[in-house]
Amino acid sequence: MTEIDLKLSDGRTLHAYDTGADDADGRLAVFWHHGSPNIGAPPEPLFAAAEELGIRWVSYDRPGYGGSTPRPGRDVASAAADAAAVADALGIDRFAVMGHSSGGSHALACAALLPKRVVGVVVVGGWHLLAPRGSTGSKGSGRVARPTCARRLPGEPH
């Protein structure tokens, strides 16, 4: 796996990872969006299967994580611009996205905001805060989540 520091036009640095830098032709690039508080290193236990399937893992540390500099005012939607910047720097036109835990929302943002570039999306163990509008943080979200899930998913255990 190759690690690179990409300098963006706004002066920030994104620390990126690429398992296919030496053999990119014909391989599907899959952008890995990490959960919190992890860094962006793609899931090494999946490398062998990815190699057999012709998958190239690409990722980056979200702003403020690992080797990436912070992005003031960052929101989930800004992940699309960052992923596009990494793809452009690596010469990747179209790619799939995969997110784990809180990275799931970042993967979904990429799929929604980059529809001409993202060919597929996978979310593994994604989460969504079900706290009431206007609340701060996730304190007490479990109390809110249970009845909300019960209404949205009748018949499921909560």
State what each model feature region is.
Residues 119-158:
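Alpha/beta-hydrolase-fold enzymes
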Residues 12-67:
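Conserved HGGG/HGGXW glycine-rich cap/lid loop of the alpha/beta-hydrolase fold
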